[in-house]
Swiss-Prot record:
Keywords: Cytoplasm, Cytoplasmic vesicle, ER-Golgi transport, Golgi apparatus, Membrane, Protein transport, Repeat, Transport. Belongs to the COPG family. It is a peripheral membrane protein. This is Coatomer subunit gamma-2. Residues 1-11 have a biased composition (Basic and acidic residues). It comes from Danio rerio (Zebrafish). The coatomer is a cytosolic protein complex that binds to dilysine motifs and reversibly associates with Golgi non-clathrin-coated vesicles, which further mediate biosynthetic protein transport from the ER, via the Golgi up to the trans Golgi network. Coatomer complex is required for budding from Golgi membranes, and is essential for the retrograde Golgi-to-ER transport of dilysine-tagged proteins.
Length: 873
């Protein structure tokens, strides 16, 4: 049963767990000892420990065997041994879901719960509530009410916490105990007060007014429990976030007053709450930052760590607010706790001046090898932010990152470094060759397939444009010889890009491709054969379409369309235009540190927002036969934030139609809305075909209604339109407490903001990694050029942002970033116009008195070119 360990096992440490080799059948056999008389508490205790151990290890107990063991265990209530009795309570809780007829112990537990032994009463309450269902709850309601207000803190806390668990099961019954919970909230015991506040909040959390009243009551009367204060701060900050209240709110005043509390945990909780408030100004942050600054010099390591970690987060959005703490943070660089020292340095990197960068980097180098991977990632993210702030310091950063790349470390750490180097390369063209050289060195000995393929993709994209592209060929082909199938396939794709862009390298690349065609893996052979045939044609249009820019369709959409095509055999070839386009990737930098993922498994391809919309809309019968969804806009608010109804609109564009999805929320708890629709009146030749109303709109439960509109067929250039919108509905008054509506109702309407349809709603962003190749591929058959003057625009940055947002196209080659101190700039934009027509825009901008723009548009359709130029004009 329990293996006897020899000396070797003891020395290796494998014998440290005496329950390691337990067998369920043997333990259940031993459980028969429970039926013996007299009861042996020590032996029974040991067997119960084994049963609980097996249950917690995930061992499966059949219903019959679990029930038999449970019934045998109930005999142990005859013993008066305190430890054995409390072990019985634990076993009851563990076996409550797997045994039958567990309610047979109800009388024993009720007896202990109401008995004189205080040591039994709390655990008995917890065990009883674990086995009680909704039908039995009323039978113990009287005992629970008494226990909540009991003078013994452990009993009261047990009853309160058990009540909190039962709220999910029987909310209406537990709600009747609110008076007792309020009495417990005035207890002198800090844990009882905390648990009582928690129960009161969960009973009232769906009623904002009741929660506000509760907060006002306790802020006036005061609390003795620091835990309760922390919960109050969290509730107050949640309310502030929901109501979008500012620093003039009484709730904010309460949180700020907690900064002067005598308990450190309350002070920190208040500071943390203020720091994490959205749209918090520097003035509102100041008192919280002052408190955190004091904590930086605390003798307690936990407080120093909490302070510097929170200041680190503040520095991401408000670096100037943390500048006052720089001296305190400098002192923490030499802290004996490496985690604190790391956070101090990364915070200084965000708040420090350009002149302090070199010194800080040297200090990090002295101990970076001693800290964990998690904190190394934090350091790398701080360096990445610093590179954007001080681009001239990229050489110092690059050397530091290359040294870190050579050190040992896990996948997340290495990925953070690679991402940082790639961002430096993209932001600073002069650092490209140095960065690529470091990455080439890294993939020579890289055990992470994901990183190797990512770097090979970057080499294929950036390498051919460097002055000496041939030097990268060796590193890439080494991957074909030495690596796994996925890396070999990525290397073949990278090689093809060198051959397509550099005529001098083409013969050498073709020789290497021939070798790759002999590979043992299907994917590698197929890619090599495909690229070989494309490259041999020596046609720029083919290279652009099949090597540089590739497909720009949704992968999930392609999979579904192909599956549908195979289910319905057809003589016609598969049409790629039936597949929804992929939405362009979001490349903006995150402002917050993401938690380090522990999983190294490849993530399953998640459906995009547009894939989800496509599925939702295709399920509505009125929208059948519209074809693939072309584009979905971001939500547009049609009401103010604090109005009785909140309405936002998402515009879904198809080839010849638009669907307007109105997401409506009713914020009045005394009304039920029915047959809700938004009536639309267009200003142009758009035609409203059909309305799909929302059947019911109860209080605080969002619902959607739809309007189907046909686009103008006679004038393809008529893309812009303004709709006046009115929400129409049937109102039925209802009881705010029960939600029961009246039998009768009346029609009403609510005027919404006007809704604009612009040229951006007809264009889907598509990223072209190689814009020049795409420009040649489209050709100049449908090309037009015009010059415009923007008299009111004063900077190139502003002009670029205006053009990008207005046209709704994807900036390529990072041309949306205007270099400093430049008077001219070229912006490249790519997209697909509704109907599947490629459209490319090259805008040459010059700064003089205002900004002058020369716009050149190429497309596969003349009408699209006219639409773009007309909209810009």
């Amino acid at each position: 049963m329990i293996k006897k360990f020899d000396k070797k096992d003891e020395e290796s440490g494998s014998g440290s767990n005496p329950f390691q080799h337990l067998e369920k059948s043997a333990v259940l056999q031993e459980a028969r000892i429970f039926n013996e008389t007299p009861i042996n508490p020590r032996r029974c205790l040991h067997i119960l420990t084994k049963i609980i151990y097996l249950l917690n290890q995930g061992e499966h107990f059949g219903t019959t065997e679990a029930t038999e063991a449970f019934f045998a265990m109930t005999r142990l209530f005859q013993s008066n041994d305190q430890t054995l009795r409390r072990m019985c309570y634990l076993t009851i809780k563990e076996m409550a879901n797997i045994s039958e007829d567990v309610i047979i112990v109800t009388s024993s537990l009720t007896k202990d719960m109401t008995g004189k032994e205080d040591v039994y009463r709390g655990p008995a309450i917890r065990a009883l509530c674990r086995i009680t269902d909704t039908t039995m709850l009323q039978a113990i309601e009287r005992y629970m009410k008494q226990a909540i207000v009991d003078k013994v803190p452990s009993v009261s806390s047990s009853a309160l916490v058990s009540s909190l668990h039962m709220v999910k099961m029987s909310f209406d019954v537990v709600k009747r105990w609110v008076n007792e919970a309020q009495e417990a909230a005035s207890s002198d015991n800090i844990m009882v007060q905390y648990h009582a506040l928690g129960l009161l909040y969960h009973l009232r959390k769906n009623d904002r007014l009741a929660v506000t009243k509760m907060l006002n009551k306790f802020t006036k009367s005061g609390l003795k429990s620091p835990f309760a204060y922390c919960m109050m701060i969290r509730i107050a900050s949640k309310l502030l976030e929901e109501t979008e209240g500012g620093h003039d709110s009484p709730l904010f005043d309460f949180i700020e007053s907690c900064l002067r509390n005598k308990h450190e945990m309350v002070v920190y909780e208040a500071a943390s709450a203020i720091v994490h408030m959205p749209n918090c100004t520097a003035r509102e942050l100041a008192p919280a930052v002052s408190v955190l600054q004091l904590f930086c010099s605390s003798p307690k390591a936990a407080l120093r760590y909490a302070a510097v970690r929170t200041l680190n987060k503040v520095a991401m959005k408000h670096p100037s607010a943390v500048t006052a703490c720089n001296l305190d943070l400098e002192n923490l660089i030499t802290d004996s706790n490496r985690s604190i020292a790391t956070l101090a340095i990364t915070t200084l990197l965000k708040t420090g001046s350009e002149s302090s960068v070199d010194r800080l980097m040297k200090q990090i180098s002295s101990f970076v090898s001693e800290i964990s991977d998690e904190f190394k990632v934090v350091v790398v993210q701080a360096i990445s932010a610093l590179c954007q702030k001080y681009p001239r310091k990229h050489s110092v950063m690059m050397n530091f990152l290359s040294n870190m790349l050579r050190d040992d470390g896990g996948f997340e750490y290495k990925r953070a470094i690679v991402d940082c180097i790639i961002s430096i390369i993209e932001e600073n063209p002069e650092s490209k060759e140095t960065g690529l050289a470091h990455l080439c060195e890294f993939i020579e000995d890289c055990e992470h397939t994901v990183l190797a393929t990512k770097i090979l993709h970057l080499l294929g994209k950036e390498g051919p444009r460097t002055p000496t592209p041939s030097k990268y060929i060796r590193f890439i082909f080494n991957r074909v010889v030495l690596e796994s199938e996925a890396v070999r396939a990525a290397a073949v794709s990278a090689l093809a890009k060198f051959g397509a862009q550099n005529d001098d390298l083409l013969p050498s690349v073709l020789v290497l491709m021939q070798r790759c065609m002999m590979d043992s893996d299907d994917e590698v052979r197929d890619r090599a054969t495909f690229y070989m045939n494309v490259l041999q044609q020596k046609q720029k249009a083919l290279n652009a379409a099949y090597i540089f820019n590739g497909l720009s369709v949704s992968v999930l959409g392609l999979e579904k369309s192909l599956h549908q095509y195979t289910l319905e055999p057809s003589e016609k070839p598969f049409d790629m235009k039936t597949v929804p386009l992929a939405t362009a990737p979001i490349t903006e930098h995150k402002t917050e540190i993401a938690p380090v993922a522990t999983s190294k498994l490849p993530e399953k391809l998640a459906p995009s927002r547009q894939d989800i919309y496509q599925e939702q809309l295709s399920a509505i019968p009125e929208f059948q036969g519209l074809g693939p969804l072309f584009k979905s806009s971001e939500p547009v608010q049609l009401t103010e934030a604090e109005t009785e109804y909140v309405v936002r609109c998402i515009k879904h564009t198809f080839a010849n139609h638009m669907i307007f999805q109105f997401d409506c929320t009713n914020t009045l708890n005394d009304q039920l809305l029915q047959k809700v629709l938004v009536q639309m009146e267009p200003s142009e030749s758009y035609e409203v075909l059909h309305y799909v109303p929302a059947a019911n709109l109860p209080y605080s439960q969002p619902g959607s209604c739809y309007s189907l509109v046909r686009l103008p067929e006679d004038d393809p250039t008529a893309v812009s339109c303004t709709f006046s919108c009115t929400m129409k509905y049937l109102v039925r008054d209802c009881d705010p407490n029960t939600g029961e509506p009246d039998d009768d109702g009346y029609d009403d309407e609510y005027v919404l903001e006007d809704l604009e349809v612009t040229v951006a709603d007809h264009i889907q962003k598509v990223l072209k990694p190689n814009f020049a190749a795409a420009w040649d591929e489209v050709g100049d058959e449908c090309e037009k050029e015009e010059t415009f003057a923007l008299a009111t625009v004063r900077t190139l940055d502003e002009a670029v942002n205006n053009i990008v947002s207005f046209l709704g196209m994807q900036p390529c080659e990072r041309s949306d970033k205007v270099p400093e101190n430049k008077n001219s700039h070229v912006l490249f934009l790519a997209g697909v116009f509704r109907g599947g027509h490629d459209v490319l825009v090259r805008a040459r901008l010059a700064l003089a008195d205002g900004v002058t723009i020369q716009v050149t548009v190429r497309s596969t359709d003349d009408n699209v070119v006219d639409v773009i130029l007309a909209s810009v004009g």
